[in-house]
Swiss-Prot record:
Residues 185-196 have a biased composition (Pro residues). Its EC number is 2.3.2.31. Residues 1-140, 176-216 are annotated as: Disordered. Interacts with HAX1. This is E3 ubiquitin-protein ligase RNF217.
Amino acid sequence: MGEEQSTVSGGGGPQESQTLASGTAGHPEPPRPQGDSARAPPLRAASAEPSGGGCGSDWGCADTSAPEPARSLGPPGWSKSRAPAQPAGLALTGPLNPQTLPLQLELEEEEEEAGDRKEGGDEQQEAPPGEELEPRTRVGAADGLVLDVLGQRRPSLAKRQVFCSVYCVESDLPEAPASEQLSPPASPPGAPPVLNPPSTRSSFPSPRLSLPTDSLSPDGGSIELEFYLAPEPFSMPSLLGAPPYSGLGGVGDPYVPLMVLMCRVCLEDKPIKPLPCCKKAVCEECLKVYLSAQVQLGQVEIKCPITECFEFLEETTVVYNLTHEDSIKYKYFLELGRIDSSTKPCPQCKHFTTFKKKGHIPTPSRSESKYKIQCPTCQFVWCFKCHSPWHEGVNCKEYKKGDKLLRHWASEIEHGQRNAQKCPKCKIHIQRTEGCDHMTCSQCNTNFCYRCGERYRQLRFFGDHTSNLSIFGCKYRYLPERPHLRRLVRGSVCAGKLFIAPLIMVLGLALGAIAVVIGLFVFPIYCLCKKQRKRSRTGMHW
C-alpha cells in the first residue's frame, strides 16, 4: 500500500501533517474541500498536543506528563503511524454490525464516560459567550463504521452536513439496457465525492432517494443522507406472462376478478366468480359440494347447478373445483365414457384393456377361454365378455345365474323397505338410504319408483305414477292385495276417460256453435230495443 499526505486545517491555526495508509486498494481517501466554499467549524485532531493551560479536548484532561495511549483505529496489527488520519474532531471505531449498532453505541459510550470520569475527574468544558457547545453525537453508516462527532465550539447559526452513502445488495435482478440506466446524482458543493463500490450483480446505479433525518441531528443542524436503493421489483403478471387459465373464465379461472354477489344456493353475500355458462353467482363452497356429489354418482356430463340453465359445465371448471380424489374419479369416468365396446377396465384396478378379435373360427372348447384376460397391472384374471372374475369351466350364461341370490336378497323386506331395487333400464341394483320412492338411476338417469320398480310415467288427463286411479299409478298405492280388482277399476276409469272425453268435447263444440248462432240474431235485436227505449224516454221529458 502506498502512503499519501493529508492536511487538516483547524480554523486558521498551524497546519498539522499526518501520515495515513489507504484502507482499500482502488478507493483512496477523498480530498477535503478547501477555500471559503467549504467553511466548517474549527475542528481539532484527536492526537493534537495541548496548548496553553488546557488540553484542548472535550473529554477532560488527566496528567499531561503521561498522555493517554491512543485507541486502535483499525483492525489488529495496525500501528499508530499506519492508521489513517481522520479529520479533526472525528474518531473512527472498528467495524460494527449494523443490526446491533444501537446497542454497541450505548455500551461504548458508557465505557468511554466511565474512563473519562476516572482519568479527568469532573472537569467540564465551558463555552464562551455567544457560542454554544455542540453535544457529542454519533452517526452510524451502513458499512459498519461509526463516526464520533466530538463537541466543538461553533456559532449557533452554523449548519453542518454529513453525506453518507448506503448501498443495498441486489440479487437475481436483470440488467437494464443502456438507454434506461440512471445516472448518479450530482454531489452538492462542499461534499466529498461519492465512491460507488464495484457491483457484481448489476452495472447500473439504483435510483436516488433522499430522506430527511432530523432525528440524527441533536444540535438543530441538518444531516442529509443519500440512499441508493434497489429498483422497484417486477410485478408478477409481467414475469409470469399470460395466465395459464385465461380462456376458462368463471369459477374455474383464478384470474377472473372477484365480485361481492349473493350466492343463488346459500343466499349469502360472498366474493364470487360468475359461472361461465349462465353468468350466475354460485359461491365456491356450494359449487364444490355440488360437483363432489355429482362425481360420487358417476356423472360425466354435469349440468349447471342453476335450474334455469340447461348447459353442461366445462371439464376444466369441474376439475378445478374438485378435490384430488374426486378429480381422479372424474377423469376415470371420462375415460370410461369415451372408449368403445372393445375396451373395458379391469374390475379390480380399473386398468383399461382392449380386446382384439382373432380371425380363426372359435371352437366350443375355446369359445369362452378366449375372453380370459390377465391384468398387466394387478395380475387379476377376469372375463372380458361378462366383465366379471374369471369363471373356469363355467360359461358366462351359467355364471350369471348366480345373480338369483342377489335378486333374492334384494327382494327381501327389511326395516319396511326392500334391500335394493333394480333399475328398469340398465338392470343394476340400487339401494336407498333415505328419501322418497322417486329414484333416479346414477348410471342411465332413469326415473323409477323404488317401491314397485316401475318407471315414472305421466300423461295429462290420465294422471301420473302417484295417482290411485291412474293406469300409471303405483300398485302399492291402491288395493295392493287385490291386483285384479285394482286393474279392473283403473281400466274402467281409463276407458271411461277415453270414451267420455270425446263426447264431452263434441257436446261442448255443439253448445258453443248454438250459442254463436243465437248470439248473431239476439244481439242486434237487443241493441235496437235499447236504442228505442232511450228515444222514448227523451220524448217524454220534452
